[in-house]
Amino acid sequence: MDESLLRSLTPSVLGVLVRRGADFAAAEDAVQDALVEAVRVWPADPPRDPKGWLVTAAWRKFLDATRSDAARRRREDRVDEEPPPGPAPAADDTLQLYFLCAHPSLTPASAVALTLRAVGGLTTRQIARAYLVPEATMAQRISRAKRTVSGVRLDRPGDVATVLRTLYLVFNEGYSGDVDLAAEAIRLTRQLSSAVDHPEVAGLLALMLLHHARRAARTAPDGSLVPLAEQDRHRWDTRAAAEGIGILQAALARDRLGEFQAQAAIAALHADALTAEETDWVQIVEWYDELARLTDSPVVRLNRAVAVGEADGPHAGLAALAALDPALPRHTAVAAHLHERAGDLPTAARLYAEAAHHAPNLAERNHLTRQAARLNTHLRP
């Protein structure tokens, strides 16, 4: 029994049932029942068309459940007994499921959980462990998400940008518990790229690959963070970086620039530099200008201030930083870095300590605390 085949077919089969009129929760139950039957039947009698077999089995189980449950009987009027002629391509069914899981009515956290459950095929326990919450809490979150999208009919294409933002949230969780969420996000984005031809899908995939390429060098053996400038670039995954750059170049050639392509271009410039000193910061500032134009995001402008500090000197970076809200996350850490670059070590040490107090996670807090301690050691008479 090829479990990877079943996992790869599940989103498309689920998408078929939703397209035919099944609500999400009922469709998922039917597909799970069909998968159980496949595990039992296929070893002795493998089907010629695995997806067709699963669709037929799941559809029958859905109809049986609909007929047998009086509370669901009212839905029969809008469910055809036979599948409509001319089924949509598998890619369309998978894509519809992505749109459903990233529906605007869902909170970002619920969209992420539902995407991992329905499209990624992860168990509720795996998702709960990845997000460090009790399994019961995650089960409730997923159940609420299913109820929210039940009955939603996606007769028109959904918003690709919403799906991409959901996948990027998954990617940014990195690795937690027994699930490599970054690798899972890359897998799902690859799957999405085969279903929809959009340069921003390619841009996101390129961005993920370029960031993932640096993963092995991001932490020291003791688990502490290693800043980009100090990373051992020989530990970067050159194959993943090259793939990301190739995907990005093809996307940029279509001349439909979007925010993920711009972010990937910045990551590509870092990947191109053999050493931190060879980084083309002038081009990076130009790409941040494009990204700021596309998003008008204060976080982008914060990162731009860092790049300006590298391209034009720390005082120019501090001038760019002065125009931003000091309450921005990581504003104080950026200010500390720029003050250190400018030679103002007492101010930098104080700001590193302050930034550590407000750090969003333990790894960053420890890193900023070490930076403050390092400078304070130099300042002692």
Predicted segments — roles?
Residues 1-15, 25-28, 153-165:
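A short, charge-rich alpha-helical start-of-domain segment used by transcription regulators
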Residues 29-36, 40, 48-60, 140:
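Structural recognition of an alpha-helix C-terminal capping motif at a helix-to-coil junction
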Residues 212, 275-278, 311, 342, ...:
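Structural motif corresponding to the intra-repeat A-B loop/turn of tetratricopeptide repeats
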Residues 3-24, 37-41, 99, 103, ...:
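Amphipathic, Lys/Arg- and hydrophobic-enriched alpha-helical face
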Residues 45, 55-77:
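Arg/Lys-rich amphipathic alpha helix in sigma70-family domain 2
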Residues 73-129, 133-287:
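Amphipathic helix-loop-helix modules that constitute alpha-helical solenoid scaffolds
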